[in-house]
Design a protein with these regions (language model features):
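A recognition module on extended beta-rich or small alphabeta surfaces enriched in W/G with H and D/E
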Residues: 74-78, 205-251
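Solvent-exposed N-terminal domain segments of exported/luminal and surface proteins
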Residues: 26-124
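Extended, loop-rich substrate-binding clefts of extracytoplasmic carbohydrate-active enzymes
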Residues: 94-168
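C-terminal motif of bacterial Sec signal peptides marking the signal peptidase cleavage site
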Residues: 20-21
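Sec-dependent signal peptide recognition
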Residues: 7-13
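Acidic (Asp/Glu-rich), glycine- and aromatic
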Residues: 161, 172-205
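N-terminal secretory signal peptides that target proteins for export/translocation
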Residues: 1-6
Length: 285
């Protein structure tokens, strides 16, 4: 092989090695999400800091909300698939921390950890489970999906809700873009909220930033015997930190047990807000 051919050959080899290395790096996803038919139509997703889910039509009989459930993560490692597998195949509840994190945040029929808040006549309205889902974009660093709700009851009027949520690598906050349609002549305030549990702990309001912040102990509903004890024999699972930001919010306050950041809204407009959470036990690898 002459010198020129040798150089060309080496160039091709190095190029292939470089492409292989780039490919290996590119396929390491930092965000993820999917429809979860094996768990009553959940729609779950995660970024590097936390995992989330919203409830689907198969859960309607249990009166769920259009709120957001929160799963705590111990590291940036993706956990959604492993949590569901552990729960539904291995019989190991995700309400217990086996080292990767846990689900200890109760939503019920509330806005949960960053769900939509609609305020009309000083009353908070919470919707039910979604009717349809669509994945709009899925890459290792960006996940975008849309949920549609056919009947959000507000002050005796039925509205339709579409919410598009974006999770991006390196961003602790999810982006939510909401459009409400239907017929309602009264004033509406719309934005994001955090449900404050009975054991209301520490919260802060940054009115000028349109931001609310809340934290509480991470307590699972499993019995103490099922929990992982720390070295003091305590069932404490650390602290949960949650925040919502609605740009240009006109109200940042507590309403019906929710810490809210909402603004004036006209039907048909797109309203954008941000929500996120993390755990005191989260550590970057």
């Amino acid at each position: 092989m002459n010198e020129r051919k040798m150089k060309n050959y080496l160039f091709i080899i190095f190029a292939l090695l470089s492409l292989t290395a780039c490919h290996k790096e590119a396929v390491q996803p930092k965000v993820f999400g999917r429809y979860v038919p094996e768990r009553k139509d959940d729609f779950a997703w995660e970024n590097e800091y936390a995992a989330f889910r919203m409830y689907g039509p198969a859960l309607k009989a249990e009166n769920p909300s259009n709120g957001v459930d929160l799963w705590l993560k111990a590291s940036p490692e993706l956990v959604v698939d492993s949590f569901y597998y552990r729960e539904h195949v291995l019989g190991l509840p995700y309400h217990i921390n086996y080292g990767k994190g846990l689900d200890c945040y109760k939503v019920g029929h509330t806005c949960g950890a960053g769900g939509l808040i609609v305020l009309a006549n000083d009353t908070t309205y919470i919707g039910g489970p979604y009717d349809r889902w669509t994945i709009l974009e899925q890459t290792p660093e960006r996940f975008v999906f849309r949920l549609e709700y056919d009947s959000l009851l507000v002050a005796g009027h039925i509205l339709q809700e579409t919410i598009t949520i974006t999770a991006e690598a390196g961003e602790p906050m999810n982006r939510a873009e909401v459009v409400l349609t239907g017929s309602y002549d009264g004033e509406l305030l719309v934005g994001g909220g955090i449900y404050m549990h009975d054991t209301i702990d520490h919260f802060e309001v940054y009115e000028e930033l349109g931001t609310v912040y809340y934290e509480e102990d991470a307590l699972s509903d499993k019995t103490a015997a099922q929990m992982n004890y720390d070295f003091n024999g305590s069932t404490s699972q650390g602290r949960i930190y949650l925040t919502v930001r609605t740009p240009d919010a006109t109200v940042t306050d507590i309403q019906d047990g929710n810490l809210i950041a909402v603004k004036d809204y006209q039907l048909g407009d797109t309203l954008t807000y941000f929500f996120g959470a993390t755990w005191s036990e989260w550590k970057e690898k």
